[in-house]
């Protein structure tokens, strides 16, 4: 009994130790991969290829006397945040680094070797890639181009506003030979791609034009549909050919049987109905079971079709007796062959499954050279620079022509305004314009002039609707110059042209109160003066706001857009003829 209890205790202890080990295994975090990723990222940041392009990090190194950079700076980078935010873990990962070294405290790092001059063959080692997928990233490009050599630097331009990639990238290799290899192996543009390389995306205010994307997608869909239709047509033709072949063979087989049936149909009608029924039953039972007997029957019928009718009947009965035995033999042979095929097929399937399992254990995204053909266009950077020069020259020429057309449109519009009016009326208009212009300029310079009894205060128990809705409800009664309202406010002010207009709105309070629960009152006294001061202060603040200076191409494009909008507005206007015209 004691031995049994001792054995049970040992078993229990072993189980508890196993459970503890399992718990420890679960608790253990996978740090090796994280350490390797941290070391790789920091080595890249402090490498020659990156520091020659990364101005911020280079300046941080130059600022410090010893060339040390604090690890806390690296933790602030987004890519490092994804890996870790622990400075000690970063220091641990960089102990065995070949590029950087730690200080004695383990809180700062620096390059082991000083940064040299920028290499001159950088452009020759760099490759330009276009027709990239929409959600492309550095790891994808490194995986694809890493087959051709050691990728040192990858640059993927993005739109500033949206953050989407522009569809092209630059890949820098360690040697010129590797870059040439990438151009040779990975330059496989699809048939749909434009003949001339070089993507210079069309943008409006540094944003991709969505309409162009939609058009491109529609074109791609149409092409796909066309291909599918062609494939369907080819398949349909093949099927038709197969059906015609089968029908021809059937026709060949059915000719003798039809002749036999003709002979049978020519029999006199003196035969009794009982014999006919028996014959029909026998034929119906024999036909579905066996198809192979048709040839023998047809051949016998062909041979003896000219003989007497009684002989034909005897031959048919003999064939019917022979057919089942032949069919049973054939069925046995077929069953044996199918069993053999099944055995061989099972063996093949099992071997294939084993090989698939082995492949799945490895990384799924590994690709060997030549296995997949990625539709990319790859050029040397020097070729791309030549294309860029051509593009800039074309842009310059187009902008010059646009400038000329804008100046011509302006001169034509001035000629129309001056030449279209008679001289006498023109003189009067000049005087009136000269009188009106200074007054308008004064109003614009000083802002709205103080007029008492023009401002109406609107108070609501609930947040007021949008400015447009308030304006529309008031404009139905009288002309509104301005509505001072912020979203979610329960109070607002409306400025009218004359005190009579404001009074008309107050008089129509009953009509407004039916639709909206508003309280209306005209401002007067100190409240009115304070509000007018507020108007002037707000106006001055608006004028003092910094404006974006548009120069060069942007300035020209904005001018052209304004002219286009003005023309469209003129075209959309209704031409109204008077009764006497």
Curated annotation (Swiss-Prot):
GO terms for biological process: box C/D sno(s)RNA 3'-end processing; cell differentiation; mRNA processing; negative regulation of transcription by RNA polymerase II; negative regulation of viral transcription; positive regulation of protein localization to Cajal body; positive regulation of snRNA transcription by RNA polymerase II; regulation of mRNA splicing, via spliceosome. Gene3D superfamilies: 3.30.70.330, Winged helix-like DNA-binding domain superfamily/Winged helix DNA-binding domain. It holds the Pfam family La. GO terms for cellular component: 7SK snRNP; cytosol; nucleoplasm; nucleus; ribonucleoprotein complex. Residues 1-10 have a biased composition (Polar residues). It comes from the Eukaryota. The modification Phosphoserine is found at residues 258, 261, 273, 298-300, 337, 351. Residues 28-122 form the HTH La-type RNA-binding domain. The modification N-acetylmethionine is found at residue 1. The keyword Repressor does not apply. This is La-related protein 7. It comes from Macaca fascicularis (Crab-eating macaque).
């Amino acid at each position: 009994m004691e031995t049994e209890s001792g054995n049970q205790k040992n078993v229990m202890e072993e189980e508890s130790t196993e459970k503890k080990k399992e718990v420890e295994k679960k608790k253990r975090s996978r740090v090796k991969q994280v350490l390797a990723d941290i070391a790789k990222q920091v080595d890249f940041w402090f490498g020659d290829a990156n520091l020659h392009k990364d101005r911020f990090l280079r300046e941080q190194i130059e600022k410090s006397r010893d060339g040390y950079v604090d690890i806390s700076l690296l933790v602030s980078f987004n890519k490092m945040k994804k890996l870790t935010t622990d400075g000690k873990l970063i220091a641990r990962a960089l102990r065995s680094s070949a590029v950087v070294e730690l200080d004695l405290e383990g809180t700062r790092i620096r390059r082991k070797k000083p940064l040299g001059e920028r290499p001159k063959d950088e452009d020759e080692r760099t490759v330009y890639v276009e027709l990239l997928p929409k959600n492309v990233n550095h790891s994808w490009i490194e995986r694809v181009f890493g087959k051709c050599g050691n990728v040192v630097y990858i640059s993927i331009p993005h739109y500033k506003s949206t953050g989407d990639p522009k569809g092209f990238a630059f890949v820098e290799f360690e040697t010129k030979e590797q870059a040439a290899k990438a151009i040779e192996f990975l330059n496989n543009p699809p048939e749909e791609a434009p003949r001339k390389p070089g993507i210079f995306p069309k943008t409006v205010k540094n944003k991709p034009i969505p309409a162009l994307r939609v058009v491109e997608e529609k074109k791609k869909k149409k092409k796909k549909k066309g291909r599918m239709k062609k494939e369907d047509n080819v398949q349909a033709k093949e099927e038709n050919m197969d059906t015609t072949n089968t029908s021809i063979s059937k026709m060949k087989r059915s000719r003798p049987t039809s002749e036999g049936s003709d002979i049978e149909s020519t029999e006199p009608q003196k035969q009794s109905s009982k014999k006919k029924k028996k014959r029909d039953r026998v034929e119906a039972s024999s036909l579905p079971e066996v198809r192979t007997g048709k040839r023998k029957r047809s051949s016998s019928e062909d041979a003896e079709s000219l003989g007497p009718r009684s002989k034909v009947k005897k031959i048919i009965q003999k064939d019917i007796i022979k057919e089942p035995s032949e069919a049973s033999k054939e069925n046995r042979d077929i069953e044996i062959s199918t069993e053999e095929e099944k055995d061989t097929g099972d063996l093949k399937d099992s071997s294939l499954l084993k090989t698939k399992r082995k492949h799945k254990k490895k990384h799924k995204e590994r690709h060997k050279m030549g296995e997949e053909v990625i539709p990319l266009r790859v050029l040397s950077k020097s070729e791309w620079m030549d294309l860029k020069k051509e593009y800039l020259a074309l842009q310059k020429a187009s902008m010059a022509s646009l400038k000329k057309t804008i100046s011509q449109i302006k001169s034509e519009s001035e000629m129309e305004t001056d030449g279209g009016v008679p001289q006498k009326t023109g003189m009067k208009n000049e005087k009136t314009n000269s009188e009106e212009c200074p007054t308008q300029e004064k109003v614009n310079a000083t802002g709205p002039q103080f007029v008492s009894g023009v401002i109406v205060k609107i108070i609501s128990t609930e947040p007021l609707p949008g400015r447009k809705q308030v304006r529309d409800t008031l404009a139905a009664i009288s002309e509104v110059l301005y509505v001072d309202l912020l979203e979610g406010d329960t109070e607002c002010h409306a400025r009218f042209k004359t005190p009579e207009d404001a009074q008309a709105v107050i008089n129509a309070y009953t009509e407004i109160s039916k639709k909206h629960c508003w309280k209306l009152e005209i401002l007067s006294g100190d409240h009115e003066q304070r509000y007018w001061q507020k108007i002037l202060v707000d106006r001055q603040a608006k004028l003092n706001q910094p404006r974006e200076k548009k120069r060069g191409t942007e300035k020209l494009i904005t001018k052209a857009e304004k002219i286009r909008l003005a023309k469209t507005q003129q075209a959309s206007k209704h031409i109204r003829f008077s009764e006497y015209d």
